[in-house]
């Protein structure tokens, strides 16, 4: 299962690596020594799990082809379930925990972390609720502000570590609430960029589920629906990857008999539908968003050279 070319390039022997196993495979048991160190019972099954983002998607109900998850966390993850292999260098591709399924996915290096940075450095005395309320009173498009959310470079889909964050269109008219809304819109444009790549691969999700801290933001949820032009379902009380990992262990040890039983632990809250008129505004702004990056790519390269 290990890639020989990569191992040879790194000078690593396959003998030094563990055996690759499918999720929900019992690969051993807790030894007596490990039991003393951890407090677990000796003989407890040790089960192969999955990557955290895969377990998190599974535990949000992303388990049928076309299901899509948008994670509004410190970074921004977007995952779509497939029953066939679609390989594209702009995206990541992982096995699902369910045999025969895959998760094509992307990760934006910064998402909610930009909001945290703004709140701590530029928002003055405003708390998050005040920013929400004021941001809701700003029209879609933030009155001419467009943000590139590349504050740590960017992973997918542009794969450009030299890209930088950018706020285009500032005037003396703009206030903190304009910038706050522009941040949410810029992050949502990043997710839309991923969906456009999905569509190039003939993957067309028609709805999305939202999780993580950003799913508690009234404004961010609404902007996400309007920018993506699809209904978004909010997963309530989602514990993240821990639920997925626990279920995988339970499936391996006979607590659960089918993968579908995960559904009984998933609670869907509100569903937010896009506003067609607002979506039209965002379509035009997304084109500008993409143009800003393309026209400044060489500038980002020069800034990289100066700062390193």
Question: Which ranges hold each PLM region?
Answer:
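A glycine-/small-polar-enriched, mobile loop at the entrance of the PLP active site in fold-type I
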Residues: 15-23, 104
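Active-site core segments that coordinate phosphate-bearing ligands/cofactors
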Residues: 1-10, 26-28, 32-308
């Amino acid at each position: 299962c290990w890639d020989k070319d990569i191992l040879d390039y790194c000078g690593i022997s396959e003998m030094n690596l563990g055996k690759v196993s499918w999720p929900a495979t019992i690969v051993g048991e807790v030894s007596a020594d490990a039991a003393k160190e951890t407090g677990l019972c000796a003989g407890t099954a040790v089960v192969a799990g999955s990557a955290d983002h895969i377990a998190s998607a599974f535990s949000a109900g992303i388990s049928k082809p076309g299901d899509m998850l948008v994670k509004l966390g410190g970074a921004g993850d977007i995952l779509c379930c497939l029953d066939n292999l679609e390989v594209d260098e702009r995206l990541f591709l992982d096995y699902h925990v369910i045999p025969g399924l895959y998760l094509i996915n992307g990760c934006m290096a910064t998402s909610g972390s930009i909001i945290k940075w703004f709140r701590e450095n530029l928002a003055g005395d405003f708390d998050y609720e005040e920013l929400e309320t004021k941001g809701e009173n700003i029209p879609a498009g933030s009155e001419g502000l467009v943000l590139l959310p590349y504050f740590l470079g960017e992973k997918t889909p542009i794969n450009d570590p030299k890209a930088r964050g950018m706020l285009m269109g500032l005037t003396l008219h703009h206030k903190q609430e304009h910038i706050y809304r522009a941040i949410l819109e810029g992050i949502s444009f990043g997710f839309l960029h991923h969906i456009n790549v999905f569509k190039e691969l003939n993957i067309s999700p028609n709805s999305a589920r939202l999780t993580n801290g950003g799913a508690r933001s009234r404004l961010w949820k609404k902007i996400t629906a309007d920018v993506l032009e699809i209904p978004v379902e909010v997963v309530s009380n989602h514990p993240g990857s821990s639920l997925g990992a626990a279920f995988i262990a339970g499936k391996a040890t006979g607590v659960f008999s089918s993968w579908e039983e995960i559904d009984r632990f998933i609670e869907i809250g509100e569903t937010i539908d896009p506003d067609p008129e607002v979506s039209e505004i965002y379509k035009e702004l997304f084109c500008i968003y993409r143009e800003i990056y393309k026209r400044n790519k060489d500038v980002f390269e020069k800034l990289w050279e100066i700062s390193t």
